Amino acid sequence: MNAIKTAVAAVTAAASLVAFSPAEAATATANLNVTANVGGACSIGSGAGGGTLNFGTYDPVVVNSALGVDLFGTGSLSVQCTLLSTAVITLGQGLYPAAGSTAAVPLRRMRNAASTDYLSYFLYMDVTRLIAWGNTSGTGLPFLGLGLPVPVQVYGTVPRGQNVPSGTYNDTVVATITF
């Protein structure tokens, strides 16, 4: 008796599968629209090994005297923007700008940590130090995003002939990226 019930159940199950097979089922289709918006974004920071421009030692008596040479230095920032996004990187005037300093033509100075003496310096976009780096869209560095962090070089010069006392001179310049 159990064998008959099992056989009937098996036949019923098989018949139900045949009755609802995909060959006999109706279908309907619709499109699913899928979208995403990728916004332009940028970040700027000191990055690995960046964020500092150290000029080293300034020698106002011999090497960097009025008859000597300027002191050069190089630093870097880490910049990342969305692929193919355009941006402009600007550098502020620093904490101790000289009289007459403007956003377009910054007259930057480092201050002696132990006094109120200043050591003037300039920042440039190019290794030849011909294009001054300012804090306006016209004096900033154009940048095209690659989607990856990119080191951006900052070139500096401390002009020769500055008669200053010994000590450690510092300044902080705000780097801004506008995108």
UniProtKB/Swiss-Prot annotation:
Region forming the signal peptide: 1-25
Protein's GO biological process: sporulation resulting in formation of a cellular spore
GO CC annotations, alphabetized: extracellular region
UniProt xrefs under SMART domains: SCPU (SM00972)
Principal location listed in the UniProt entry: secreted
Secreted listed as a keyword: yes
Keywords: Secreted, Signal, Sporulation
InterPro entries: Spore_coat_component, Spore_coat_U/FanG
Subcellular location as annotated: Secreted; Spore, Perispore
Origin superkingdom: Bacteria
PANTHER family per the UniProt record, alphabetical: PROTEIN U-RELATED (PTHR37089)
Role summary: A late-developmental spore coat protein.
Protein name: Protein U
Organism phylogeny: Bacteria, Pseudomonadati, Myxococcota, Myxococcia, Myxococcales
Chain's gene name: pru
